[in-house]
């Protein structure tokens, strides 16, 4: 049994550590203030920005409605033990992950994560809100909103690699009905949580080799999306999006939903559709950070999937790297960009602890948002507008070594989570829970 002196000594040590952290934050606050940055305001603002956490990191995009392989030109690699196998395990894992994350959260769900009870099963074209009641209960208990995605992959009705663009009318109609069902489910999510639901339409439709007809599939794709969006919904509650992609595994030569197609569709249907950009879905030399202000010039709202592509859409865990920071900066710097941009994460790594993957990616983007909010953006804009490019460069370089780590520690403290040392909790969860899964 430990003595009172030992316990008292530990408490004193903890108090001194907290005082040291506050001293460091006060020092950082003064440094930022010299550049006109209010770190208290930055922290307060960062707490208000919702970021949608994707459920599919927890089980390698398997879902609950099939036991077949992952298709659609996407791929998970690795076989780290502890993958969630049931709705109960997935929800428990998400809970553990979210308990270690600062900031405001939403939950992003794919249609293949319908939770059927009492032996019930319906196909994707017959899905109903009741099949996602547990997700709604889970989100409401935690004060979170929900986003949604029709699942146009990993299903027998994906014929010859095509869904909404298929020349087979039966195939197209099946997927159109799936999309309409997802509109209804998205409306249910928003009505129940009181938070708008982003519903993203993405398919892996395309061809492995050079097609003879490039336009036909795109015309069919457009008509299918038109049919999906003919389903009645409240545009204040449901935010349908179309997402493009440059290529996928097995569809290297031609993707129906290309960047030009998807952006054009959203532009022609601004009243009911948003453009969604995934920063892994473009040529490796393109950067989504540069596209954000371009789209916000013309669209009232846009949506993002933030990932980390390595040479292709590899969906590596998001890190606090250059492009992640630039994406966050553009969200913050663009006029009302924070209020006009729906942010979600999208990555899946099966080679590492999946809870750690969730937490690392979410924290990395939170850190990027906080860093962006702590930039002297108005000063830098003024320097650019007055052609003081040398000074702008100097200040931008100076910003790279500002004490953002101390501001981050204070942000985490105010959010009730550890800035560092949180991996011990994940290791404990792995030892006590994940390692027991066959």
Model regions and ranges:
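Active-site oxyanion-binding pockets that recognize sulfate/phosphate
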Residues: 165-172, 210-214
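Aromatic- and glycine-enriched pocket-lining scaffold segments that form the walls
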Residues: 196-210
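Acidic/histidine-rich catalytic cores of soluble enzymes
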Residues: 210-323
């Amino acid at each position: 049994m430990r003595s009172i002196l030992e316990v008292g000594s530990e408490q004193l040590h903890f108090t001194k550590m907290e005082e040291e952290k506050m001293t460091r934050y006060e020092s950082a606050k003064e440094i930022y203030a010299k550049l006109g940055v209010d770190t208290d305001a930055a922290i307060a603002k960062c707490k208000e920005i919702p970021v949608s956490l994707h459920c599919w990191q927890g089980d390698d995009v398997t879902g609950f409605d099939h036991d077949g392989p992952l298709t659609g030109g996407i791929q998970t690699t690795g076989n780290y033990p502890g993958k969630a196998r049931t709705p109960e395990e997935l929800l428990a894992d998400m809970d553990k992950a979210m308990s270690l994350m600062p900031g405001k959260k939403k939950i992003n769900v794919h249609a293949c994560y319908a939770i059927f009870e009492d032996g019930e099963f319906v196909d994707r074209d017959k899905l109903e809100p009741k099949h996602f009641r547990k997700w709604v209960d889970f989100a409401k208990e935690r004060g979170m909103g929900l986003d949604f995605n029709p699942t146009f992959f990993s299903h027998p009705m994906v014929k010859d690699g095509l869904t909404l663009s298929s020349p087979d009318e039966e195939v197209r109609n099946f997927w159109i009905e799936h999309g309409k069902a997802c509109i209804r489910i998205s409306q249910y999510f928003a009505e129940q949580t009181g938070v708008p639901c982003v519903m993203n339409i993405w398919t892996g439709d395309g061809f492995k080799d050079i097609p003879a007809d490039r336009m036909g599939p795109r015309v069919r794709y457009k008509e299918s999306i038109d049919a999906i969006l003919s389903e009645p919904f409240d545009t204040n509650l449901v935010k349908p999006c179309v997402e493009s992609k440059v290529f996928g595994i097995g569809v290297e030569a031609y993707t129906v939903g290309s960047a030009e197609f998807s952006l054009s569709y959203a532009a022609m249907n601004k009243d009911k559709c948003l453009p969604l950009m995934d920063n892994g879905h473009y040529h490796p030399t393109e950067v989504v950070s540069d596209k954000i202000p371009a789209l916000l010039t013309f669209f009232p709202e846009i949506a993002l999937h933030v990932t980390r592509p390595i040479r292709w859409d590899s969906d590596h865990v998001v890190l606090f790297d250059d492009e992640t920071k630039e994406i966050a900066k553009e969200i913050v710097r663009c006029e009302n960009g924070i209020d006009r941009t729906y942010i979600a994460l999208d990555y899946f790594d099966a080679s590492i602890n999946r809870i750690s993957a969730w937490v690392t990616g979410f924290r990395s983007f939170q850190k990027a948002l906080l860093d962006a909010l702590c930039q002297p953006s108005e000063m830098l804009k003024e320097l650019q507008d007055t052609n003081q490019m040398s000074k702008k460069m100097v200040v931008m370089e100076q910003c790279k070594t500002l004490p953002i780590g101390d501001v981050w520690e204070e942000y985490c403290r105010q959010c009730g989570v550890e800035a560092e040392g949180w991996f011990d909790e994940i290791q404990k969860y792995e030892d006590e829970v994940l390692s027991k899964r066959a």
